[in-house]
Structure formats: structure tokens, C-alpha cells
């Protein structure tokens, strides 16, 4: 039996008293996290490689008001664990000069705290958070999908003035019945996915309309005076538009990945390096050292499309669902020339340009759709790698 972590998100509307308690919990969690960040800022590889980090007990002794907080003590410990994860990510990715832990702010659009020692029972249609925080009403449409006895932890989150309770369950997920399909997938900018069956899949038009809504609200924000009440109100509207876009894209990716996993036993994909693919265009200089045209505007537009379409999120969903449901997902090398190889005779068309969507093989004369041909080659190469590994 293999247990998996599965989350369920339940929106709720707290009472005025409960909302005030939750806001204090968010603030206390931020305080504990920021104390860790402040200690980390004293870190120096040469002079102070091991700064002293305060623990929960020490912070409660030094700050009596924290001892009376309605937040569960376990949630304060989880704030320290979250900081340690952020610190580990920083040291792991320090070569990029990013991901340094930063102070949490009360102005962040997302506020949350997590309790890993939950109550595993229901009071009718209400879930009790704790004695001090009270309970949350769960509506019929949000009824629990898994037994409450399997609850692992819960998180209360406020995102753009909307509260939600995220329940994390330990669930035994059974593999699905064996499917017959074997496909290759080519990710693209013009179409989100091209399958080796010839099917091309793109995001629905509604997603593009939501993107236009974000741009429109962002333009309005740029005209507001920073720090004014109008600016703060418009910033909340922009954050809400971004959240709506993100949730819609995430939901579409879940539906699409579920369908591909349901229909196919074997899936072949490219190995993606999104960080490298979305770098700026290299500078080009002429003989006199003056800058030349380097296609930076087109490269910038392509980078926006790659990041907007959320390739990494879709690949992650396919990966964990394939593992859950007993499917085989193989990723081919990122330098494999899937678009340039003729699927019928194996000839390599070295002069293929990005603007050429269709091409004819010089050796066998068979016409190819660039993306469908790439998906077929990815499928065959993934099958070959799978046989070698077996």
C-alpha cells in the first residue's frame, strides 16, 4: 500500500471575531518567520557561518504576548520549518544569485499558517480548528472527499481577501487499469501540446480573455499614485485577476493531464530547461564594437509565451499522476533533434528554421508538419530509452 498526500481546498467566510483571530495568527506566524530571517541576515561564510536562530520557547519567553496567541504552537514550529526550507533552497540555488529568504510582510496577498497536529473529527457539518479559533462550516458542495481519520494537516490561507481551509490527507491511491495508448508530446508556443496522433491542443479562448483582463487592470494600476488608497484598491483588483487566471490555467492543466494519463499507458516528452529557454537574447556586436540586431524583441515575446503557458506546471502534473496511477513517463534528452529528423527515413534537415512550420524531406520527399513530426520522434526515442532501461 502506497500512501499519497492529497489536498482539498475549502473556501469559507469567518465571523468578524474569528477573522480577527485569524489575522492575529497570520501576524504571529510572520513574526516567528521574520525572526529567523533576521538571524539569517547575520550569516557570513567567513566570519559568522553558524548564526544563532531563536526557537519557539525562547521567543515566547522574550515576548509574553506570543504566549497568549490563539495560533497553535505547532504552527509556529512549522513557520521555522518553512524558513529552513527557504534557506536550503537558497544555498542550493545560490549560483543564480536569487531565492534569498526575505521578510514576510503584512501586505503580501497570500497569508497562511499550517497545523500538522490536526483534530481528526467533525462536529456535524463543521470542522473544529482549535478551542481558541473555533470551527469552519463546510458546505454540501465542499463535502470531504476522503475520511477525516486520514487528515494529515490543515492550512488556513487568506488570498485576496478570501479565506480558505486546505486539508491535506494521506490517501491510498490505486493504479488505474492498463491503457493501450502510447504517445509522444511536443510542447510548443503556437500550440500548447502537439500529440503524436496529430492532435493539437491549446488553452481555451477564455484563458486568453483572462490574460487581457490582467493587462487592462495592470495598466490601470500603472496610472495610480503609489501609496494612495486608489493604488491599494487597484493592486487588490490586479492580484484578484492574477489569481483567477492562475486558478483557471491550473484547472485546465489538471483536466488535460488527467485525460492524457487516463487514455495512455506510455507517454514520451522532452526534458525541459525553462530557465535556459527564457534567457535574454545574446548581444551581437559588429566589427566596430557597435550593437547589432539580435532578435531580442521576438525572443522576449517567446519567453513571455513560455512562462505564460506554464509548461513546468503541466509536466509536473503529468509526472506525479503517472507515478500515482501506474503509467510510464519517459523524458528524452533536451538536445535530441526531434523537429529536424524525418520520422519516415531518419534524414536530418540541418537547415530547419524556427519560422518553418512545415517542411519536405530532402531524401524521401515526404512532407511533414513540424510539431507532429517532432512528437512522433519523441515517442519513438522515449520507447527506445524505455526498452534499453528494461
Residue ranges and their predicted role:
Residues 6, 16, 20, 31, ...:
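Positively charged, helix-rich recognition surfaces that bind polyanionic ligands
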Residues 1-77:
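Gly/serine-rich nucleotide phosphate-binding loop at the start of the catalytic core
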Residues 30-40, 79-87, 214, 319:
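Short, Φ-rich (hydrophobic/aromatic) sequence segments
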Residues 7-9, 114, 124, 133, ...:
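Broad gene-expression machinery/nucleic-acid interaction feature
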Residues 8-12, 136-142, 146, 201-203:
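Generic detection of short hydrophobic beta-strand segments and adjacent strand-loop junctions
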Residues 53-157, 292, 298, 304, ...:
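Acidic carboxylate diad motif detector
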Residues 36, 79-90, 372-382, 386:
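Stable alpha-helical structural segments in soluble proteins, enriched in small hydrophobic residues
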Residues 37, 41-44, 87, 91-98, ...:
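Long, hydrophobic, amphipathic alpha-helical segments used as structural scaffolds
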Amino acid at each position: 500500500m502506497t500512501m499519497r498526500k492529497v489536498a482539498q481546498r475549502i473556501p469559507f467566510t469567518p465571523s468578524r471575531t474569528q477573522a480577527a483571530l485569524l489575522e492575529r495568527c497570520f501576524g504571529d506566524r510572520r513574526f516567528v518567520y521574520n525572526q529567523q530571517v533576521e538571524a539569517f541576515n547575520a550569516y557570513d561564510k567567513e566570519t559568522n557561518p553558524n548564526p544563532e536562530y531563536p526557537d519557539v520557547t525562547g521567543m515566547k519567553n522574550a515576548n509574553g504576548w506570543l504566549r497568549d496567541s490563539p495560533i497553535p504552537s505547532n504552527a509556529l514550529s512549522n513557520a521555522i520549518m518553512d524558513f529552513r526550507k527557504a534557506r536550503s533552497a537558497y544555498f542550493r540555488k545560490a549560483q543564480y544569485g536569487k531565492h534569498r529568504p526575505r521578510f514576510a510582510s503584512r501586505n503580501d496577498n497570500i497569508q497562511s499558517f499550517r497545523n500538522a497536529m490536526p483534530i481528526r473529527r467533525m462536529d456535524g457539518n463543521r470542522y473544529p480548528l482549535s478551542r481558541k479559533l473555533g470551527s469552519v462550516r463546510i458546505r454540501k458542495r465542499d463535502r470531504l472527499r476522503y475520511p477525516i481519520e486520514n487528515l494529515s494537516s490543515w492550512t488556513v490561507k487568506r488570498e485576496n481577501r478570501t479565506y480558505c481551509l486546505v486539508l491535506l490527507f494521506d490517501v491510498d491511491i490505486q493504479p488505474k487499469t492498463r491503457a493501450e495508448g502510447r504517445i509522444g508530446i511536443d510542447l510548443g508556443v503556437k500550440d500548447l501540446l502537439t500529440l503524436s496522433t496529430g492532435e493539437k491542443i491549446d488553452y481555451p479562448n477564455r484563458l486568453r480573455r483572462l490574460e487581457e483582463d490582467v493587462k487592462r487592470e495592470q495598466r490601470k494600476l500603472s496610472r495610480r499614485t503609489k501609496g494612495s488608497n486608489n493604488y491599494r484598491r487597484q493592486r487588490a483588483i490586479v492580484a484578484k485577476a492574477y489569481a483567477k487566471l492562475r486558478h483557471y490555467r491550473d484547472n485546465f492543466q489538471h483536466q488535460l493531464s488527467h485525460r492524457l494519463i487516463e487514455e495512455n499507458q506510455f507517454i514520451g516528452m522532452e526534458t525541459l530547461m525553462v530557465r535556459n529557454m527564457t534567457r535574454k537574447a545574446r548581444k551581437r556586436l559588429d566589427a566596430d564594437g557597435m550593437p547589432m540586431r539580435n532578435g531580442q524583441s521576438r525572443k522576449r515575446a517567446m519567453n513571455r509565451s513560455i512562462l505564460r503557458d506554464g509548461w513546468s506546471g503541466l509536466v509536473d502534473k503529468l509526472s506525479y499522476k503517472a507515478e500515482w496511477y501506474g503509467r510510464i513517463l519517459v523524458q528524452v534528452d533536451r538536445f535530441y533533434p526531434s523537429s529536424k529528423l524525418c520520422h519516415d527515413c531518419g534524414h536530418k534537415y540541418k537547415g530547419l528554421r524556427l519560422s518553418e512550420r512545415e517542411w519536405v524531406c530532402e531524401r524521401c520527399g515526404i512532407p511533414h508538419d513540424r510539431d507532429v513530426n517532432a512528437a512522433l520522434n519523441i515517442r519513438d526515442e522515449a520507447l527506445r530509452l524505455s526498452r534499453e532501461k528494461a
